[in-house]
Amino acid sequence: YDGTNCKPGVCWEPKPGY
């Protein structure tokens, strides 16, 4: 994803290697 990644119930900023 671009910007922030979101899963059911949690969101976080994309980290290198993910």
Swiss-Prot record:
Belongs to the methanol dehydrogenase subunit 2 family. Disulfide bonds join C6-C11. GO terms for biological process: methanol oxidation. This is Methanol dehydrogenase [cytochrome c] subunit 2. It comes from the Bacteria. Heterotetramer composed of 2 alpha and 2 beta subunits. GO terms for cellular component: periplasmic space. Its EC number is 1.1.2.7. One of its GO terms (molecular function) is alcohol dehydrogenase (cytochrome c(L)) activity. Keywords: Disulfide bond, Methanol utilization, Oxidoreductase, Periplasm. It is an enzyme of class 1 (oxidoreductase). Catalyzes the oxidation of primary alcohols including methanol. It comes from Methylomonas sp. Pfam families: MDH (PF02315). It is found in: Periplasm. It catalyses: 2 Fe(III)-[cytochrome cL] + a primary alcohol = 2 Fe(II)-[cytochrome cL] + an aldehyde + 2 H(+).
